[in-house]
Amino acid sequence: MTFRTLPIRAAAVAAGLAVATPALAQNASFFVVHGIPGRDVAATADPLLPVDVLVAGKYCLLAGFTFGSVAGPFDVPAGSYSVAISLANPIAPCTNTAVITATATLTAGEFGSIVAAESTSGAPTAEIYPVDVTSIAAGKQRIITSHAADAPEVKVTAIGSNPKEKAEFKLQPGKQNESTVDTAQKFSISATPVGAKGTIGPITVEAGDRSDILVWAVGNAANGSVTLLSKVLPDVY
């Protein structure tokens, strides 16, 4: 699949990757999402499960990156990049053996998210989800929800400040939904496993007009760790 306040280290790495590109139009952009809680790995693991993210075999993009965090967006030249995720090494970041590897193919002008998550078999993996950055009309917002959890189909509900500002849909594992809604200053977003009791969330997301509201479902249903993460991409004109 193809797709598009940084820490000083990450900003420097992104700048290094961008050296070869003569024009921004040839770039792609992406977020990195940490969606694996430590308790899904081992009972004794750090709940935040800090990891390091190495790109292209030599750029340590993120060090000590913790569960629930969303980093970026990063702008890089279009192309294919290896991504290696390892348990964090605070002394020598990005030098531990990779526990997740993936290849991200970035096409010029595209935007996306690389999500460290659990597959439906429970194994750690890196999934790539596109982010729609086409123009949004005035008075509208776009909610883009990605099901990256080791969990069954869920019913997602997003309710704005006014009950008329609402989106509701079902989402299969590994799939994505895009809903355009009337602008609300604040949305309450929750998910319910289809055919099961209990609600995931809600989380509260604040966003301005013409914003992309990005939501990722991550975690493991069997361990009771499924949660919702979010990021706002403002001013999508």
Give residue ranges: language-model regions.
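...the same signal can extend to comparable exposed beta-sheet modules
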Residues: 1-2, 189
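Bacterial N-terminal signal peptides that target proteins for export
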Residues: 2-11
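Intrinsically disordered, low-complexity polar regions and short flexible loop motifs
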Residues: 24-237
